[in-house]
Amino acid sequence: QYLIESHRSIGVKYETKLNSHKIDIQLREQSFKINSKLIIRPWLFQFLVGDTPKYLSYLRLGDILVVGTPSDFSGELVDPIEKSISNKSLNLMINSFNGGYIGYVTDDKWYDRDDINTYETYTMNWYGPYNGKYFSELIKKIIEINEKH
């Protein structure tokens, strides 16, 4: 009886953080590489493929942070991003295909290499080099914003 009454006197506090946002992003003009010498011009790419929404989105629910990208986002980029998190209780999930599609986003070191001109790192990198670093930095900024709140 005493244990039950003592238990009821313990203060309980629940706190749930809930936040979401959509952030428009800027990218260079898109193109499609057929090979290292033949690249479809941006205006023709636009005519053939059309335009797509370009934004990052995030949802914060408690200690879970879900970041959506408009790409096929390389898992190789996730580990360095996770290591940048100072709040170790924050659980990060990065998702691809958040409503738009801009092609593959891979580590910049793989872009335009002659020895590995693969589908993912060459043909499907529609917006050119440096997007691996660019997206990683944007996601780190989203993490910083959410670590403060």
Model segments located where?
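Non-catalytic substrate/cofactor recognition surfaces at enzyme active-site rims
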Residues: Q1-H149
